[in-house]
């Protein structure tokens, strides 16, 4: 779910304005591409801002999708910078600042939705242009992985485009809302890491289509996994040992979003 501006609007949650010292989050292709392009990926919410919460937690799903998108793009010769690569504060004004400083050819902001709806939607600028083409190309790829679409959309605000990421970025930019996390059937479309990664790869293919890059539709790359914080890893180890579970079984269970939270609660209850 996308938080629009620093002041907030229409009762939506706001992102705090935080000054953050960031590590380099730019990933450069291993081999130089003569048509080298740059893409910025905003990863919605993070840290104390969980985003929408339902059958899945938005900030976590956003990161899995974004990492998969990044890795697929890099594998096809695109340089990528992400607003975050782990669970940390990521206010929208900082995303916009980083994006403009990076000066990419295209930008996307990865989010998931709430409000009881169903399906994917993508927002682009009122001015259309390349941003609209990018939105349409991403939508086509998302439909191919089995998710229905609510359409390519715009939203009018007092300053033109309502959403800051679309309005204030200098390059063509879109906001992707993968699923509604509070609708059971729709959340199931992104209910595992593998399914979340499929969304990220679909976004990447839409970006490549817009850039005019060719890609092997049958090829697959193994996306990076989000970093597991020390507290969560300790809880996983504690429960695994107590239950006598194999590493393979644990990894299978952890593919489901709700299991991670369950493991934390079990570990806390164990003496």
Placement of each model-derived feature along the sequence:
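A short, flexible beta-alpha/helix-coil linker loop
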Residues: 46-49, 181-186, 246
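Catalytic-core environment of secreted peptidases
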Residues: 37-54, 108
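Short, intrinsically disordered N-terminal pre-domain segments
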Residues: 1, 35-38
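Short, solvent-exposed alpha-helical surface patches in non-cytosolic proteins
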Residues: 222-271
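Intrinsically disordered, low-complexity segments enriched in serine/proline and basic residues
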Residues: 1-3, 9
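Short, Lys/Arg-enriched N-terminal segments with co-localized hydrophobic residues
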Residues: 9-34
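Glycine- and acidic-residue-enriched helix-capping/strand-helix junction motifs
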Residues: 50-64
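Active-site-proximal helix/loop segments of hydrolytic enzymes
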Residues: 37-38, 60-222
């Amino acid at each position: 779910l996308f938080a629009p501006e620093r002041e907030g609007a229409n009762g939506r949650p706001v992102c705090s304005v935080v000054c953050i010292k960031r590590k380099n989050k730019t990933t450069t292709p291993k081999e130089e591409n003569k048509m080298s392009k740059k893409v910025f990926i905003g990863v919605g919410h993070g840290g104390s801002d969980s985003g929408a919460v339902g059958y899945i937690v938005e900030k976590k799903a956003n990161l899995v999708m974004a990492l998969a998108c990044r890795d697929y793009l890099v594998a096809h010769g695109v340089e990528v910078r992400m607003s975050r690569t782990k669970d940390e504060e990521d206010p929208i004004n900082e995303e916009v600042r980083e994006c403009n400083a990076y000066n990419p050819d295209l930008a996307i902001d990865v989010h998931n939705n709430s409000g009881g709806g169903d399906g994917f939607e993508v927002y682009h600028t009122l001015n259309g242009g390349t941003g609209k083409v990018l939105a349409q190309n991403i939508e086509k790829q998302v439909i191919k992985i089995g998710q229905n679409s609510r359409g390519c959309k715009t939203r009018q605000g007092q300053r033109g485009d309502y959403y800051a990421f679309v309005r204030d970025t200098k390059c063509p930019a879109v906001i992707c809302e993968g699923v509604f996390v509070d609708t059971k059937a729709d959340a199931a479309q992104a209910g595992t890491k593998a399914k979340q990664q499929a969304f990220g790869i679909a976004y990447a293919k839409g970006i490549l289509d817009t850039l005019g890059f060719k890609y092997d539709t049958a090829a697959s790359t193994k996306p990076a996994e989000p970093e597991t914080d020390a507290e969560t890893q300790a809880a996983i180890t504690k429960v695994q040992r107590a239950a006598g579970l194999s590493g393979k079984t644990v990894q299978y269970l952890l593919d489901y979003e709700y299991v991670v939270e369950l493991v934390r609660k079990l570990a806390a209850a164990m003496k």
